[in-house]
Amino acid sequence: MTSTDFKLDMSMMLTIHDASRRELGRIAKIAARNDDDPKQILRSAIGWQMFKKYLRIHHTTEDETVWGLMEQKLAEKPDRDLLAAMEAEHAAIDPLLDAIDEALGDRDYGSQRLAGLVDALATSLGAHLKHEEAEGLALIDSTLSQEQWANFAAVHLKRVGDEVGTYLPWLLDSASAEWTDMVLTRLPPHGRVNYEGSWKAAYDELDLWAPTTTG
């Protein structure tokens, strides 16, 4: 699937999905480690905090500016079943994030619970992303106007706020040069200048998943 499959620009949506899958893979690898304490690594990792925050921003903004609006536009139509499924899938993910955080703070049984919870998160979120790409994006594309879709992007960016200089390189971490260039061409000129001038370099200095020896 590419952004050219739609009349609306889905490039950032697909980039967010790819970033979520990438981070899920990294989290799963940490949870499966036996040379360090995965619980300690995740509990203090910048990467875990960023993943949770950006995922919640994305889903909350979708719920409020996309699915909620589409419910009104598609009232009494069969497509509302798909909207209900999207919202239910979102609702199932937040409790898994909370359960993982609880396990990370559980000194007695957290290590035993962690791998199963991470696997449940990967399964739930992975299935949601696949479902949204298979059916949800096409429904968005056929229902929302350019202005309504632009509002989703604007609200999303506002919620990221001052962290945009970290958020954008995080999104594009491990993206191909071609895909990165495509995303950057869709930004205002200063966005590319900042990304190439300082944002990416500062992000590359971060050790998102560094193990720690404290706590």
Regions found by a protein language model. Name each.
Residues 1-215:
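Small-residue-biased structural context
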